Structures are given as structure tokens and as C-alpha cells.
């Protein structure tokens, strides 16, 4: 997600495969900022997000693959796993527990230790209510 919601929720070490609307850069000189700006060079400034047809940041991709390879448990939630290349990264998981939480079936359900066919947001709300008690 490009909306920074994970960071606002307190998550650390978020890998932004598709970039972030919180960062902007100049296409001409590469100057960056955490807000939209007019570049001194007169170049076009755009948000640091990956649009359809553009390549993902390879450093972020490599780190995502590394983290997946190292994980003992991987929870995949709220995704149909049909958008590539991100859906392909599950092939790197070698851990013990693959958990898929999605309201529809996915192509990886047969490989998962646990599949919960439910709405992720509703499920997390119930989990949080249990934890708060």
C-alpha cells in the first residue's frame, strides 16, 4: 500500500513494494522531499510510487524475498494473490506455517497450514476485542 497506513498504525520496518505517497521526487534531477514541491531545476515532480507497467524498486524486492525466505510463519491477509509480481513472492517461503486470511479462495490455499475464508478487517477487529478483554 502506498498510503502510509501501516506506519501510522505503528508498524516498523515496512517494505513499500509500490512506494509511498509520502515521498516525492524530481524526474529531472532526482531531488527528493517528503512533500510535493516545485523543483529548482524546473523538472516534473511526482510521488514516489510505482505505476502499472513500471518496475518495482529492486532493493525493496530483494529485501522482501529475503524476509520471506527467513520467516518461520507467514501470514498473508486481505489479498487474492492474483497481482504479480507480489503474488509470486510466496514461492520463496520455506517456513512451517503459511496462514492465508482472505474472503475468497487463493491459488495458494492448498499450500497453507491454515486458511481463514473471512474478511480480514472484521477478523482483526474481533481479535483486538479479545485481546483488550
Model-based region annotation:
Residues 2-133:
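Conserved catalytic alpha/beta core of Sir2/sirtuin-type deacylases, generalized to analogous enzyme cores
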Amino acid at each position: 500500500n502506498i498510503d502510509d497506513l501501516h506506519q501510522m498504525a505503528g508498524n516498523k520496518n515496512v517494505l513499500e513494494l509500490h512506494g509511498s505517497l509520502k515521498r516525492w521526487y524530481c524526474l529531472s534531477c532526482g531531488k527528493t522531499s517528503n512533500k510535493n514541491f516545485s523543483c529548482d531545476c524546473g523538472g516534473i515532480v511526482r510521488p514516489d510510487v510505482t505505476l502499472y507497467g513500471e518496475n518495482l524498486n529492486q532493493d525493496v524486492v530483494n529485501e522482501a524475498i529475503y524476509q520471506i525466505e527467513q520467516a518461520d510463519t507467514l501470514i498473508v491477509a486481505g489479498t487474492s494473490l492474483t497481482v504479480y509480481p507480489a503474488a509470486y513472492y510466496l514461492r520463496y517461503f520455506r517456513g512451517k506455517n503459511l496462514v492465508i486470511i482472505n474472503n475468497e479462495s487463493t491459488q495458494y490455499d492448498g499450500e497453507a497450514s491454515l486458511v481463514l475464508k473471512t474478511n480480514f478487517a472484521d477478523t482483526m477487529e474481533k481479535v483486538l476485542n479479545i485481546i483488550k478483554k
